[in-house]
Amino acid sequence: MNINSHVQLPNCVLRNFRDETDPEKKVWYLDVQTGDILRKSSKKLGTCKGYYSETGERFWAENIENPLSIITHRIQKYCTGEIPCLQISADDADACKRYIKAAFIRSKMAEDEMNKHSVTASTCTEQSNHDMLACFGLRSYGPIESNLEKMDVSVLINKTERMLVVPRNCFYLVTSQDVPHIVAPVCPKGAILLMPREMACAGMTAVVSDPNVIEEMNIWTLCSELEFNSAFVAANSRTELELLKYELPLRHDTCSSIV
């Protein structure tokens, strides 16, 4: 049976970007290929029928999406003031790092590299290749894991009137004090933040109160998506995507490699 699978960005994150003012609670998204701004259900956006097998779907649910869903729910409640404090446990941090690694593995860039270098890819079905890349990729150890081991997990809180957007790629890199940080938006007002251990925030939160910083972060979101997939950037606000749409002609050619 072919399942309608989220290729990369899981529904447990995407649903947090629904437009709550919309009676249908759909997600706004910018198609970075066409520049069109459209709406779609979070259950359908970024999906492909038969992309993963039932076994592949269970693998992602057990290893990534179920633990991530619990963490993102807590982050969202903290951002909206529904809970007074937020603690990131060692298990939470491990789950967040697995999410980032999984995003690398599930990108179009990773799939293209596998198809280019694998001696068996051409003899297997696309679905089998996707499943194998998921299983072996998540269990492998290489430069991605080495870099993630040197980072601590914090939470970024958006205290501005602007909204964070999220790429299909799940995360993006930003540079602070000449050091790369990983940002993975999980709701319009919050993101998972990975930074070098020596720069980690006391109390495990970093607060952004300048709307210009959020605008810059959203541009990095667009750049990351252009680099890894060239698919879409999603938001709960059409306004944020209208602003990014004006950046598209500039960023198509100027976004340099961020990997």
How would you name each of these model-derived features?
Residues 1-259:
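Alpha-helical structural context detector biased toward long hydrophobic helices
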